[in-house]
């Protein structure tokens, strides 16, 4: 507590931005300077054996900095925003208690937002019979059909939730069915109450340069063995799981199921990655109060470090 008897909020630095913009290197540089530990804010890096397609941080890249929320689930296991929220808040508490700065880095907007704001996830008002009906419809008539039903009652949630994320599409429909309230409206009510003392940094760059980096990253992933990584999952019989809906996996799965050629799969992977980057930027700009740093002309580590020091009233190792 401070002198006024108020509970001091935990300090958290957050680095967000589109895929391939350079978040990983920045986060490690900042962690070294600010005595920090890193929490992944990526919903797919949680999966073991899914390393290349998720651009998972390597041991070498970590350079001794502790990382959390990486490799905590098997690919066939499901994972919810609510579980992410609970685990990450626990890590924030524990890192703070050790006298370190929690640094969340990633591009999965809703997951990060659920941690920072007063989001409350409740399954109490569920309707199992309705849920089963929707699951049956998704199987019989396709995921797009169920997603279209969501568009009719809650277009905001439909815009945010991809059609392939059937579980979340059905959950949003279920909330509307049981409460008459849109999931998007429920979330909006919870979007204004920050739980932490947050410095929220966003990285951006010239769109064409970003798209070139994304295309190059896909080529590098293929050279590193993405095809073999996905083949391993496919040969293990992993199908219809949350994990393989990720960009980088669903496209290569189409190749293994003879829907497309390998060349077409790689081309689609690049297209989907570019579209995802665009959606990420739009989402962050619309949903969160981000201080943006343009890294088109090179990294801005020193500038960002000074900003975080000022915002969170910290002193870095570099300024001692």
UniProtKB/Swiss-Prot annotation:
User: Could you say which residues bind ATP here?
Assistant: 17-24
What GO molecular-function term can you cite, just one?
tRNA dimethylallyltransferase activity
Q: Which GO terms describe its biological process?
A: tRNA modification
> Which residues are noted in the entry as substrate-binding?
19-24
> Which EC number(s) does UniProt give?
2.5.1.75
Q: What keywords are annotated for this sequence in UniProt?
A: ATP-binding, Magnesium, Nucleotide-binding, Transferase, tRNA processing
Give the reactions, separated by semicolons, that this protein catalyses: adenosine(37) in tRNA + dimethylallyl diphosphate = N(6)-dimethylallyladenosine(37) in tRNA + diphosphate
Region (Interaction with substrate tRNA) residue spans: 42-45
Which Pfam family, giving just one, matches this sequence? IPPT
The record's SUPFAM superfamilies line, in alphabetical order, gives:
P-loop containing nucleoside triphosphate hydrolases
Site feature: Interaction with substrate tRNA: 108, 131
The cofactor named in the record is: Mg(2+)
Q: Which family does it belong to?
A: Belongs to the IPP transferase family.
- What does the subunit comment say? Monomer.
Under NCBIfam families, the record lists: miaA
- Tell me what this protein is called: tRNA dimethylallyltransferase
- Which species does this protein come from? Bacillus thuringiensis (strain Al Hakam)
């Amino acid at each position: 507590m401070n002198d006024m008897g108020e509970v001091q909020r935990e300090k958290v630095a957050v680095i967000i931005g589109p895929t391939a913009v350079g978040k990983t290197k920045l986060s490690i540089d900042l962690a070294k300077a600010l005595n920090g530990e890193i929490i992944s804010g990526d919903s797919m890096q949680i999966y073991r054996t899914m390393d290349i397609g998720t651009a998972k941080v390597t041991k070498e890249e970590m350079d001794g900095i502790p990382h959390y929320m990486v490799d905590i689930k098997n690919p066939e296991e499901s994972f919810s925003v609510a579980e992410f929220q609970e685990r990450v808040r626990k890590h924030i508490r524990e890192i703070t208690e050790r006298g370190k700065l929690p640094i969340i880095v990633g591009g999965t907007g809703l997951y990060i937002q659920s941690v920072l704001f007063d989001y409350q996830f409740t399954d109490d008002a569920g309707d199992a019979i309705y849920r089963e009906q929707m699951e049956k419809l998704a199987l019989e008539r396709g995921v797009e059909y169920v997603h279209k039903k969501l568009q009719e009652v809650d277009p905001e949630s439909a815009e945010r939730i991809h059609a392939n994320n059937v579980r979340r599409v059905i959950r949003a429909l279920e909330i509307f069915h049981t409460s008459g309230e849109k999931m998007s409206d429920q979330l909006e009510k919870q979007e204004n109450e920050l739980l932490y003392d947050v410095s929220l940094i966003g990285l951006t760059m010239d769109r064409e340069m970003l798209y070139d980096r994304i295309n190059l990253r896909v080529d590098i992933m293929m050279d590193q063995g993405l095809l073999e990584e996905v083949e391993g999952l496919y040969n293990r019989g992993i199908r219809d799981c949350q994990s393989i809906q990720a960009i980088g996996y669903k496209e290569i799965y189409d190749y293994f199921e003879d829907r497309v050629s390998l060349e077409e799969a790689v081309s689609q992977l690049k297209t989907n990655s570019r579209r995802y980057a665009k959606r990420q930027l739009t989402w962050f700009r619309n949903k969160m109060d981000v201080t943006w740093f343009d890294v088109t002309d090179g990294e801005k580590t020193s500038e960002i470090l000074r900003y975080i020091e000022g915002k969170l009233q910290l002193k870095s190792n570099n300024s001692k």
